[in-house]
Amino acid sequence: MGFMIEHWDFSTPMATQETTTAEHIQPNHWYHCERLHPDIRSWLEDNHVPRATVDHLLADESRPSFHPLDDDNFMLILRGINMNENASPEDMLSIRILYFQGALISTRKIPSRAIMEIRQALAEHKGPKSLASLLNQIIEGLNGKIDLYLDTIEETLNEFDVNDESTYNHIAAQKALISIKRFIRPQQYAIRDLIESESELVTSRPHQYRFAHNNITRINETIEFYLGEVALFQDEIKHNRDEKTNKNSYLFTLVATIFLPTSFLTGLLGINIGGMPGVESSMAFTWFCIALIVIFGLEWLLFKRLGFTNKTDDE
């Protein structure tokens, strides 16, 4: 059975790994399977799992959700951070869990670090002792990996500088947070629905499951807070950029206003209709330059008195 990654028996106080072929689903057993393997569908259907449930369990795309079935059976679809090598963490992996006839069946396409750690703990006889504890640890393991990734986002946010006008890091962090939020928000509702279903797995460990729900709620609130931080940084950068643009525009306008009268006078002299005034005088150019300087000075004093120059100094 190539689709069976691991098979554990939780019917005894210490979980034991099964190495024999699992033709039939047994209560208190955990079957961790490869979702894309061609034989898994026939195995599920041979064990009387409804075809609609099988289709949903093996679907290519799915969002986090909880689906109650008959006789205390249910399906829980979760998402986790992809922490595999060369993977983009925000491309979240999917863990599909089916509780059917007292057995827990989990399927995956991409290996999950959280599941791998649980399997390692079981191999070292340090893992969960029951299916209820196993499911809770899967949920909390996924929560923990999301928390670790959000720590890296927080470090990125702490490095933001409002004086740095480059928005590449801001946009990258914003995209990552939005990608995670897309799945984590419905995951919070899925875990809430699991708790409210009062399944025997949940009722045996109610406090642990509520703690897991509190954690995913806190994670969602953290994501919302970080998105607000990114938006605030972007607003501050835009504000600083607008202020700089306004200051430069004001300065150019002030300079143009100062030169406007002198430009008019020099242009008037350049018309040369009826001859240029002062051509016969050797001091004409000197007196004209002195007049321009006086005009510059008077304009500057006028602008200073009106407070126009103080505005550029303050900015």
UniProtKB/Swiss-Prot annotation:
UniProt free text on domains: The intracellular cytoplasmic domain forms a funnel-shaped homopentamer. 25 well-defined Cl(-) ions were observed and some of these binding sites are highly conserved within the ZntB family. The presence of the bound Cl(-) ions increases the stability of cations along the pore suggesting they could be important in enhancing cation transport.
Membrane topology, from the record: Multi-pass membrane protein
Protein name: Zinc transport protein ZntB
GO molecular function, one term: cobalt ion binding
Chief location of this protein within or outside the cell: membrane
Location in or out of the cell: Cell inner membrane
Membership in a protein family: Belongs to the CorA metal ion transporter (MIT) (TC 1.A.35) family.
Catalytic activity: Zn(2+)(out) + H(+)(out) = Zn(2+)(in) + H(+)(in)
Key words of the record: Cell inner membrane, Cell membrane, Ion transport, Membrane, Transmembrane, Transmembrane helix, Transport, Zinc
Assembly notes: Homopentamer. Can assemble pentamers in the absence of the transmembrane regions.
Upper lineage: Bacteria, Pseudomonadati, Pseudomonadota, Gammaproteobacteria, Vibrionales
Matches recorded under Pfam families: CorA (PF01544)
Chain ranges on the Periplasmic side, renumbered to this chain: 272-282
